[in-house]
Amino acid sequence: MSNKNDSFVVFDRVQKSYDGLSLVVKDLNLHIKKGEFLTMLGPSGSGKTTCLLMLAGFETATHGEILLDGKPINNIPPHKRGIGMVFQNYALFPHMTVGENLSFPLEVRKISKHDREKKVMQALEMVQMSDFINRKPAQLSGGQQQRIALARSLVFNPDLVLMDEPLGALDKQLREHMQYEIKNLHKQLGVTVVYVTHDQSEALTMSDRVAVFNDGQIQQLSTPDGLYERPENAFVAQFIGENNKLAGQIKSVNNREVIVKTSQNMEVKALKVNCGDVGTDTTLSIRPERIHLNSKYINKVDATIKQLIYHGDHIRCLIKIDKDNDFIVKIPNSNIKSTLKIGEKIPISWDTMDCHALDA
């Protein structure tokens, strides 16, 4: 987590309730560094968008304080916070040209006509849209409209830009392209970005750090690789990427490792991450690409192939390891496809360090 001394955005014990009874955000403490790209990731209703709206000034915190560059902003209206915003629906004025859309936030800030024209052109050049300055939004594609919305959020040189699921309406290929464009702009400008999405691939691709939300709380705050490789609880392991899980009970504990007995009496050696003592229930988490089609590693079992699905760069293999559990295995695409057959029995194994013992 960021040191408090270099924090640009701070949520200090922030709570939010809409009905005065239930909390949709629960005691949120979060420090975001200047120039950082932080993503709030989580399912619908997890509290992530409410946090963004409180930071923007469109919602008020029920309790706690939000600070921007060291100053409390709870009572400052949205238009005086100096924050750029990008929405999923673009929110462009349909009766204005592209140039007029970008000029509007500068007019509100009493920028001179000469400086407005200069800043508008600079912003359009950043997103490679200067040739479209005289077009109306209806004459643009979805991707072009999103670029204009992005340029408008940056045109007045804000220190902080908030993005609320900005790529949700785009098709897959364009969405992936825009992810890289936004990340490159962030690097180029050094602006602080707080990004909200439920799409894990967006979060992992673009972010410096990701805050995973569920039930109004941050479940884990980490770098993208930290979330994927070292999930701290069963929710994060299941929400980030694909995950195989086994339920069991802890049989023994030895420093950082545990032996877990599953419901089918299989004993599994795992890394102790977030679990209790001997006799308590736990959930084991193993990523599909960490399972090997051999008996080389300490955790091994014979499995039966149920399904083979071709994915281009890899083959997705669904296997049954016992009467209660199926696993997914990702196999790099090679000639192995022709050697595997549905119904075939194969040995599989995985390393202790790739198997995490988490909360039940």
Model feature map: region roles:
Residues 62-65, 115, 215, 247:
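Conserved coupling/switch loops of ABC nucleotide-binding domains, chiefly the family-specific signature
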Residues 2-11, 16-27, 76-77:
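A short, flexible loop at the N-terminus of ABC-type nucleotide-binding domains that lies
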Residues 56:
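Helix-to-loop junction immediately C-terminal to a conserved catalytic motif
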Residues 78-84, 88, 92-235:
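ABC ATPase nucleotide-binding domains
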Residues 64-72:
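Conserved ABC transporter NBD signature motif
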Residues 41-43:
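The feature captures the beta-strand-to-loop junction immediately N-terminal to the Walker
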